[in-house]
Protein backbone atom coordinates (compact mmCIF):
# COMPACT_ATOMS: atom_id res chain seq x y z
CA UNK A 1 0.00 0.00 0.00
CA UNK A 2 1.08 3.56 -0.58
CA UNK A 3 2.15 5.94 2.13
CA UNK A 4 -0.64 8.29 1.08
CA UNK A 5 -3.23 5.59 1.65
CA UNK A 6 -1.69 4.77 5.03
CA UNK A 7 -1.94 8.44 6.03
CA UNK A 8 -5.55 8.56 4.83
CA UNK A 9 -6.46 5.44 6.84
CA UNK A 10 -4.66 6.85 9.88
CA UNK A 11 -6.71 10.04 9.56
CA UNK A 12 -9.93 8.06 9.24
CA UNK A 13 -9.04 6.03 12.32
CA UNK A 14 -8.46 9.20 14.34
CA UNK A 15 -11.84 10.53 13.16
CA UNK A 16 -13.57 7.29 14.12
CA UNK A 17 -12.07 7.53 17.60
CA UNK A 18 -13.12 11.16 18.06
CA UNK A 19 -9.64 12.62 17.61
CA UNK A 20 -10.32 15.14 14.86
CA UNK A 21 -7.35 17.38 15.65
CA UNK A 22 -4.99 14.43 15.29
CA UNK A 23 -6.75 13.39 12.11
CA UNK A 24 -5.91 16.72 10.50
CA UNK A 25 -2.17 16.05 10.85
CA UNK A 26 -2.28 12.80 8.88
CA UNK A 27 -4.86 14.05 6.39
CA UNK A 28 -2.96 17.27 5.64
CA UNK A 29 0.11 15.16 4.83
CA UNK A 30 -1.98 12.90 2.59
CA UNK A 31 -3.49 15.95 0.83
CA UNK A 32 -0.02 17.35 0.09
CA UNK A 33 0.81 14.07 -1.66
CA UNK A 34 -2.49 13.75 -3.59
CA UNK A 35 -4.33 17.10 -3.67
CA UNK A 36 -6.81 15.90 -6.31
CA UNK A 37 -8.11 13.05 -4.14
CA UNK A 38 -11.65 13.96 -3.07
CA UNK A 39 -11.82 11.27 -0.38
CA UNK A 40 -8.83 12.79 1.42
CA UNK A 41 -10.30 16.29 1.17
CA UNK A 42 -13.67 15.05 2.45
CA UNK A 43 -12.13 13.44 5.52
CA UNK A 44 -10.03 16.56 6.13
CA UNK A 45 -13.09 18.79 5.77
CA UNK A 46 -14.95 16.65 8.30
CA UNK A 47 -12.00 16.84 10.71
CA UNK A 48 -11.79 20.63 10.37
CA UNK A 49 -15.55 20.91 10.91
CA UNK A 50 -15.41 18.84 14.08
CA UNK A 51 -12.76 21.12 15.58
CA UNK A 52 -14.73 24.19 14.49
CA UNK A 53 -12.28 25.33 11.83
CA UNK A 54 -15.22 26.12 9.59
CA UNK A 55 -13.48 28.29 7.00
CA UNK A 56 -10.87 25.59 6.40
CA UNK A 57 -13.58 22.94 6.16
CA UNK A 58 -15.40 25.21 3.71
CA UNK A 59 -12.30 25.40 1.51
CA UNK A 60 -12.00 21.60 1.40
CA UNK A 61 -15.63 21.08 0.43
CA UNK A 62 -15.42 23.82 -2.21
CA UNK A 63 -12.41 22.08 -3.72
CA UNK A 64 -14.30 18.77 -3.81
CA UNK A 65 -17.08 20.51 -5.73
CA UNK A 66 -14.51 21.83 -8.21
CA UNK A 67 -13.44 18.22 -8.77
CA UNK A 68 -16.92 16.65 -8.54
CA UNK A 69 -19.72 19.24 -8.95
CA UNK A 70 -22.51 16.70 -8.35
CA UNK A 71 -21.18 15.39 -5.03
CA UNK A 72 -24.29 15.59 -2.84
CA UNK A 73 -22.43 15.19 0.44
CA UNK A 74 -19.95 17.96 -0.42
CA UNK A 75 -22.87 20.31 -1.09
CA UNK A 76 -24.46 19.35 2.23
CA UNK A 77 -21.23 19.68 4.20
CA UNK A 78 -20.42 23.00 2.55
CA UNK A 79 -23.89 24.20 3.50
CA UNK A 80 -23.21 23.26 7.12
CA UNK A 81 -19.88 25.11 7.09
CA UNK A 82 -21.49 28.20 5.62
CA UNK A 83 -24.36 28.08 8.09
CA UNK A 84 -21.91 27.86 11.01
CA UNK A 85 -20.23 31.01 9.69
CA UNK A 86 -23.52 32.89 9.44
CA UNK A 87 -23.70 32.68 5.63
CA UNK A 88 -27.24 31.34 5.57
CA UNK A 89 -28.20 32.60 2.10
CA UNK A 90 -25.29 30.77 0.52
CA UNK A 91 -25.92 27.69 2.68
CA UNK A 92 -29.48 27.44 1.34
CA UNK A 93 -28.18 27.04 -2.21
CA UNK A 94 -25.90 24.18 -1.25
CA UNK A 95 -28.58 22.45 0.82
CA UNK A 96 -30.88 22.71 -2.21
CA UNK A 97 -28.22 21.17 -4.44
CA UNK A 98 -27.63 18.34 -1.96
CA UNK A 99 -31.37 17.67 -1.82
CA UNK A 100 -31.63 17.80 -5.60
CA UNK A 101 -28.86 15.24 -6.08
CA UNK A 102 -30.15 13.01 -3.26
CA UNK A 103 -33.86 13.68 -2.78
CA UNK A 104 -34.35 10.67 -0.50
CA UNK A 105 -32.13 12.17 2.22
CA UNK A 106 -34.13 13.29 5.23
CA UNK A 107 -31.02 14.94 6.73
CA UNK A 108 -30.61 17.17 3.69
CA UNK A 109 -34.30 18.08 3.66
CA UNK A 110 -34.33 18.91 7.37
CA UNK A 111 -31.20 21.06 7.08
CA UNK A 112 -32.73 22.98 4.19
CA UNK A 113 -36.01 23.51 6.04
CA UNK A 114 -34.23 24.66 9.19
CA UNK A 115 -32.04 27.23 7.46
CA UNK A 116 -34.94 28.53 5.38
CA UNK A 117 -37.03 28.96 8.54
CA UNK A 118 -34.28 30.86 10.37
How would you name each of these model-derived features?
Residues 59-84:
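Mid-chain, well-packed structural core segment of small domains
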Residues 1-4, 92-118:
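Terminal, low-structured helical/coil segments at or just beyond the last alpha-helical repeat
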Residues 16-29, 51-63, 85-97:
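Structural signature of tandem alpha-helical TPR/SEL1-like repeats
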Residues 4, 38-39, 72-73, 106-107:
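Helix-start (N-cap) detector for alpha-helical repeat units in TPR-like alpha-solenoids
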